[in-house]
């Protein structure tokens, strides 16, 4: 996910473990890394405020993957998710492990108290242990696919090696005798590594407890009770992580009273929550004793990002809001963080607006900014609304939609470095809200003097698979907004200098309390919509993943609204996770009546809350709900006072009824038999991947108790069919596990593409293409490399469309095959019969699908009717696969209309067979024509390429493009850029993002141009001298503006009293050249003046009738370049631009050192 400047981790050479790796895991460890401490330590707050650290970015993705892992429905699904998790932990897209990244991030706020070798050893051991776990996972995957004595033996061996290594480096969470991840004085720096390693160890032990008997793990001597070890280590690892988190927390809290001290403390709390506490919160759900099946896990904690206020990214340019002179302080900032409160959901915000003024002119609004908030929130499954109030409220208000906001772009303003506010905010909503954006709009005065400066600050937590979240890929949503002063001095009476802070909850915290009939549903009790009198919310002790409910006497805990799937007539068992200093009786009431359970005390009064303080207790009586939504009331009895009862969550465990029948078995047998040839060694010619998945659905629906043997045999057969289907599929990642990866091939997609999983239509994943946005189509595509293809061969693209409108399917080789699908949503009804599997009776559903498909297969159709079929096939033929150009096959799916859409899956590209006869002759003729046209295009491209290359060569003085020609200016770079832009066939005409035949040379030249632009900007002592960033870094009066012509920006002085100026620094006593490219429009003169502190001055004058530096006479409306040599005697310099009349256009201003 992140891009990082620190140490690089190498990748292993193969995905399998050799015997040497297994025996000597850390010898020549390919995942070892040496930290670059100089780049990690003492990072200025200016470099990280309002920015999520690199390690925390990865941790957000890792934490979300862990949530998915806990809900994994099968061993196969679990293995796939864990492979993904390992990739993120060992490197992600940054190439660095979470161990490297977290240490570097923490060193920016925590003192280094150990030698670098201790940290290097910890990183190496962490990476090595995860590598050993991956070796174990490979053996588990092999055993799962082919369980036999050999695979079981290999699995046991690798399990024991990994288990021993985790024991060595984690030392059972000892606080006094730590292993390499718990060394003295390094515990806090290594804590994220410890938490991640502990999670993998617990996951390893969970597998042993669940599957170990089948491996023969428990036949060994001496006998080891891995279930007991798992339960014990969950507690030990939890307590260790919480202990050292709190140590760092308290150290930073005592560091000082300044705003800077608070920001460091706040960063620690936020990022260690993401890197450590979120992982720790999942530990309890790995206890196989309590969670033998998949579990819905929810994080209810709130992450508060840094306050939004104007920040000078250079300390030389002014005072930021947290500067000492502005009086923001630790206490006031910390007090603005809300106390624990209900886990409710944001509906909308009512934002109050007020003025920013100067004391000398209190009636003149310099800006109008965010003064206060009224967040309107609701409980889950409820229409009840209450308000959370912060800041100061005015009569000028704006109401902003608050549902499912995953990103906020704020504009902070600064008045004379003394008064602060937020004058604008754009709120990004997810796809369920139409991917819309809501805008709060204040006001910024832009005329006159003493106007505010503004700064854009983007606030979000990354998506699971993207640094910048999207409407489809995000991990957190906005839960609260807070307007605060933080102690800022108030320089103008009756006015408010303030900041804005955002709070975020994890997307796993569901807005609807839906009880799943197929897995355990955990619901944090902070989601109650009616809290009992006397109930308080208390802070997470560090391992809950959110706040707790507390009572000190008997009475109601509250009312929780839940949604049951009543059509299933499902039964559930109920249990709670709680801690109590006294014996209690808990009653639960709902449409099912009232059930009660005695709960014993778990802790002593006055003790700190630890993992062992909590117990999970199940009610003896199951329930069968009769209403949905239902109101669940929880009450604590009998009478007591001055005790402590804490309740974390309530859980619903489904009681699975028998739901199979003989006809389901017969339908499954028929579906499986239809997949194979008579000899059963291959798939029938016309069988598509969709048919294999649907047959597997029918088999999975069968009862293990009644049809265990039949189901086993059918599963083996259908798995064989699926393997055959996957083996022949030339498309990579047909399950859409990774989209827009950094790999060369694989799926690439635009915004508006989402992945859906489950449901009645697809066994695996499907893709959904939303409607296009104006001129931006929604698309997903993949290239099959030419090395995977055979010359003069026919290939077929297959898939299944649930429904679509204006779906275009293109197959491109050296020609294009185009298909349009408008498929009605006509397969099954919206209601599903009782006794269904996973909420859907898949056996009956498949019968309905089959009936519709039979009609499509046997009914004669015209072209319009064919476009409406759910299944599709498209054919394309290859030519001679000329090695001089990559002639792979592109498979493209796109929607270009604003009312189009599509849901499709089971995509495969398969070889049909070699061409022959007329088909072969036709392809040979087409291939000859295509080769001739390619030669013509290449000749034309080569001419343009040579001209562009020569122009770019002129920009540099060396072959490595590391030094710019001192004689060139921006005009030379623009001339070269225009030549590069004239190169054709850079991208495909089907989808702009697909490379064309000239993509590589275009990219080569563009990269060199980019280097030239970078060097041009770097050498210029004048900031923003090309005005590409508007008037940033310039002091400008009215009448000065920046305009744009194509890719060129230029300064315009439109009146004789307009002026811009800038102060900058140089090396004194060096030779510099002032070079200006400008044009004078109309009468009068334009001036660019340079001066130093010693009052040495030089001026370049421009008028409508002038000569350029080459002596060429120019006329009005022509840009020319002038230059003058200057030897500054002081460090500080000023440049000023003005004119006498008419208009003055300045393309660029350079002040470049030419000689030391």
Swiss-Prot record:
Propeptide residues, chain positions: 1-23
Please name the GO terms of the biological process aspect recorded for this protein, alphabetically.
Answer: sporulation resulting in formation of a cellular spore; symbiont-mediated killing of host cell
Q: Would you say which domain of life the source belongs to?
A: Bacteria
GO MF annotation terms: signaling receptor binding; toxin activity
The record's section on SUPFAM superfamilies has: delta-Endotoxin (insectocide), middle domain (SSF51096), delta-Endotoxin (insectocide), N-terminal domain (SSF56849), Galactose-binding domain-like (SSF49785)
UniProt entry tagged with the keyword Transmembrane helix:
no
Pfam families from the UniProt entry: Cry1Ac_D5, Cry1Ac_dom-VII, Endotoxin_C, Endotoxin_M, Endotoxin_N
What family does this chain come from, according to its entry? Answer: Belongs to the delta endotoxin family.
Other remarks in the entry: Toxic segment of the protein is located in the N-terminus.
- Function noted in UniProt: Promotes colloidosmotic lysis by binding to the midgut epithelial cells of insects. This protein is toxic to Galleria mellonella.
Name the UniProt record assigns to this protein: Pesticidal crystal protein Cry9Aa
- Whose protein is this, by species? Bacillus thuringiensis subsp. galleriae
Gene encoding the protein = cry9Aa
């Amino acid at each position: 996910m992140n891009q990082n400047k620190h140490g690089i981790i190498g990748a292993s050479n193969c995905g399998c473990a050799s015997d040497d790796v297994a025996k000597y895991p850390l010898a020549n460890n390919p995942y070892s890394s040496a930290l670059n401490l100089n780049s990690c330590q003492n990072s200025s707050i200016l470099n990280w405020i309002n920015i999520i650290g690199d390690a925390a970015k990865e941790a957000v993705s890792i934490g979300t993957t862990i949530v998915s892992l806990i809900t994994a429905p099968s061993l196969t699904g679990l293995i796939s998710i864990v492979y993904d998790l390992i990739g993120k932990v060992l490197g992600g897209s940054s190439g660095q492990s979470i161990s490297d990244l977290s240490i570097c991030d923490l060193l920016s706020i925590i003192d280094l108290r150990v030698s670098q070798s201790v940290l290097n050893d910890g990183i190496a051991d962490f990476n090595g242990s995860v590598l050993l776990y991956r070796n174990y996972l490979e053996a588990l995957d092999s055993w799962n696919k082919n369980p036999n004595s050999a695979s079981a033996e290999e699995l046991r061996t690798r399990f024991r090696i990994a288990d021993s290594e985790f024991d060595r480096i984690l030392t059972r969470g000892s606080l006094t005798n730590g292993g390499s991840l718990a060394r003295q004085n390094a515990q806090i720096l290594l804590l994220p590594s410890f938490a991640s390693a502990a999670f993998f160890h617990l996951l390893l032990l969970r597998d042993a407890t669940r599957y170990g008997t089948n491996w023969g793990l428990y036949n060994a001597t001496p006998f080891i009770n891995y279930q007991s070890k798992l339960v014990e280590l969950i507690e030990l690892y939890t307590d260790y992580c919480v202990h050292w988190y709190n140590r760092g927390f308290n150290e930073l809290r005592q560091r000082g009273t300044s705003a800077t001290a608070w920001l460091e403390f706040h960063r620690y709390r936020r990022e260690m929550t993401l890197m450590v506490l979120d992982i720790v919160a999942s530990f309890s759900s790995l206890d196989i004793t309590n969670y033998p099946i998949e579990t819905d896990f929810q994080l209810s904690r709130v992450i508060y990002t840094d306050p939004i206020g104007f920040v000078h990214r250079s300390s030389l340019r002014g005072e930021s809001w947290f500067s000492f002179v502005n009086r923001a302080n630790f206490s006031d900032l910390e007090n603005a963080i809300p106390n624990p409160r209900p886990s409710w959901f944001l509906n909308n915000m009512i934002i109050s607006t007020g003025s920013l003024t100067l004391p000398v002119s209190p009636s003149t609004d310099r800006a109008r900014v965010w003064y206060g908030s009224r967040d309107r929130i609701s409980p889950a499954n409820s229409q009840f609304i209450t308000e959370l109030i912060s800041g100061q409220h005015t009569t000028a208000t704006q109401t902003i939609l608050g549902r499912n906001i995953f990103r906020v772009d704020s504009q902070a303003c600064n008045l004379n470095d003394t008064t602060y506010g937020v004058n604008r905010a754009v709120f990004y909503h997810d796809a369920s809200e139409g991917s819309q954006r809501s805008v709060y709009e204040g006001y910024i005065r832009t005329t006159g003097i003493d106007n505010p400066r503004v700064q854009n600050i983007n606030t979000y937590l990354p998506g699971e698979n993207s640094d910048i979240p999207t409407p489809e890929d995000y991990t957190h949503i906005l839960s609260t907004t807070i307007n605060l002063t933080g102690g800022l001095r108030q320089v103008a009476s009756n006015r408010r200098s303030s900041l804005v802070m955002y709070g975020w909850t994890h997307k796993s915290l569901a807005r609807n309390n839906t009880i799943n009939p197929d897995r355990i549903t955990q619901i944090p009790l902070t989601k109650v919509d009616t809290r009992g009198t006397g109930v308080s919310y208390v802070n997470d002790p560090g391992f809950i993943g959110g706040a707790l409910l507390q009572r000190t006497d008997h009475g109601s805990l509250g009312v929780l609204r839940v949604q049951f799937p009543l059509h299933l007539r499902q039964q559930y068992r109920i249990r709670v996770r709680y801690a109590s200093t006294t014996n209690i009786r808990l009653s639960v009431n709902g449409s099912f009546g009232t059930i009660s359970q005695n709960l014993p005390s778990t802790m002593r009064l006055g003790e700190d809350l630890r993992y062992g303080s909590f117990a999970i207790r199940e009610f003896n009586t199951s329930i069968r709900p009769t209403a949905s939504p239902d109101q669940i009331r929880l009450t604590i009895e009998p009478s007591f006072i001055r005790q402590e009862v804490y309740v974390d969550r309530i859980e619903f465990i489904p009681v699975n009824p028998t739901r199979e029948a003989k006809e389901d078995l017969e339908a499954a047998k028929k579906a499986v038999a239809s997949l194979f040839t008579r000899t059963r060694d291959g798939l029938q010619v016309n069988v598509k991947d969709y048919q294999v998945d649907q047959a597997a659905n029918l088999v999975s629906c069968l009862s293990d108790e009644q049809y265990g043997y039949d189901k086993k045999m059918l599963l083996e057969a259908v798995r064989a069919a699926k393997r055959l289907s996957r083996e022949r599929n030339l498309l990579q990642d047909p399950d859409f596990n990774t989209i827009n990866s950094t790999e060369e091939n694989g799926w690439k997609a635009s915004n508006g593409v989402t992945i859906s999983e489950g449901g009645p239509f697809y066994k695996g994943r499907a893709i959904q293409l939303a409607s296009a946005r104006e001129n931006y189509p929604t698309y997903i595509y993949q290239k099959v490399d030419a090395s995977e293809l055979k010359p003069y061969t026919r290939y077929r693209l297959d898939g299944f469309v649930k429904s679509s409108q204006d779906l275009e399917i293109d197959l491109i080789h050296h020609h294009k095959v185009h298909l349009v699908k408008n498929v009605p949503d006509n397969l099954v009804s919206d209601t599903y019969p009782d006794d269904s599997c996973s909420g859907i009776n898949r056996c009956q559903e498949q019968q309905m699908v089959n009936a519709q498909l039979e009609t499509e297969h046997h009914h004669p159709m015209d072209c319009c009717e064919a476009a409406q079929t759910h299944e599709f096939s498209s054919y394309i033929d290859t030519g001679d696969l000329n090695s001089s150009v990559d002639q792979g096959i592109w498979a493209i799916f796109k929607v270009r209309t604003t009312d189009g859409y599509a849901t499709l899956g089971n995509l495969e590209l398969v070889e049909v067979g070699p061409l022959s006869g007329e088909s072969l002759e036709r392809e040979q003729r087409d291939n000859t024509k295509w080769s001739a046209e390619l030669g013509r295009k290449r000749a034309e491209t080569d001419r343009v390429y040579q001209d562009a290359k020569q122009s770019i060569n002129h920009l540099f003085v060396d072959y490595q493009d590391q030094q710019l020609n001192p004689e060139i200016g921006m005009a030379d770079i623009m001339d070269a850029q225009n030549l590069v832009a004239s190169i054709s066939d850079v991208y495909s005409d089907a989808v702009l993002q697909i490379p064309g035949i000239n993509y590589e040379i275009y990219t080569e030249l563009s990269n060199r141009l980019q280097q030239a632009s970078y060097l041009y900007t770097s050498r210029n002592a004048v900031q923003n001298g090309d005005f590409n960033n508007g008037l940033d870094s310039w002091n400008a009066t009215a009448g000065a503006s920046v305009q744009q012509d194509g890719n060129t920006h230029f300064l315009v002085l439109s009146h004789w009293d307009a002026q811009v100026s800038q102060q900058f620094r140089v090396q004194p006593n060096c030779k510099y050249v002032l070079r200006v490219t400008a044009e004078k429009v109309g009468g009068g003169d334009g001036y660019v003046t340079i001066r130093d502190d010693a009052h040495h001055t030089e001026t370049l004058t421009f008028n409508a009738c002038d000569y350029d530096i080459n002596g060429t006479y120019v006329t009005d409306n022509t840009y020319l370049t002038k230059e003058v040599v200057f030897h500054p005697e002081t460090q500080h310099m000023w440049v000023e631009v003005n004119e006498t009349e008419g208009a003055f256009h300045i393309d660029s201003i350079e002040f470049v050192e030419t000689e030391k």
